[in-house]
């Protein structure tokens, strides 16, 4: 009797272990890395991801500061302090508005920087063409 119980439990553990091992291996070999995900994105989405990376990092740092402050306080966990409750509509709307403003400011700054670079490039090309024309033309020659 006892051997059949051990045999059954052995089968159960073997079946469970094989299911778990299969899941782990499938997860490991079918989940793309971050680099592969970025490579698969369209150029517009990849550019947007790169633009918003700093914003996400700043948001994460702010969250970590709030977590550190909450951890140091003696208040219960449900008293979130500076973190807005997800059930408060006015707080989350203000946060969303602030996030959208920051995002718009960042996009505007990047667009201005891109325009400045294009203008500098055009200015340099114009100067090069002007120098080339001046060097070819002899202004003091009569013929």
From Swiss-Prot:
It is found in: Mitochondrion inner membrane. It comes from the Eukaryota. Residues 99-131 form a coiled coil. One of its GO terms (cellular component) is mitochondrial inner membrane. It is a single-pass membrane protein. Keywords: Chaperone, Coiled coil, Membrane, Mitochondrion, Mitochondrion inner membrane, Transmembrane, Transmembrane helix. InterPro entries: Cbp4. The chain crosses the membrane at residues 5-27. The keyword Mitochondrion applies. GO terms for biological process: mitochondrial respiratory chain complex III assembly. The keyword Membrane applies. Pfam families: CBP4. Essential for the assembly of ubiquinol-cytochrome c reductase. It has a direct effect on the correct occurrence of the Rieske protein, core 4, core 5 and apocytochrome b. Belongs to the CBP4 family. This is Assembly factor CBP4. The gene is CBP4.
């Amino acid at each position: 009797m006892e051997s059949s119980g051990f045999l059954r439990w052995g089968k159960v553990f073997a079946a469970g272990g094989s299911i778990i091992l299969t899941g782990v291996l499938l997860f490991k070999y079918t989940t793309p890395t971050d680099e592969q995900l970025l490579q698969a994105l369209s150029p517009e989405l990849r550019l947007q991801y790169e633009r918003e990376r700093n914003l996400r990092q700043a948001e994460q740092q702010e969250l970590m500061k709030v977590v550190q402050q909450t951890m140091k306080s003696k208040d219960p966990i449900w008293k979130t302090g500076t973190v807005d409750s997800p059930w408060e509509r006015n707080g989350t709307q203000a946060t969303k508005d602030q996030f959208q403003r920051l995002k718009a400011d960042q996009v505007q700054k990047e667009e201005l920087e891109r325009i400045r670079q294009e203008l500098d490039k055009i200015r340099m090309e114009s100067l090069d063409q002007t120098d080339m024309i001046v060097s070819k033309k002899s202004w003091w020659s009569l013929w």
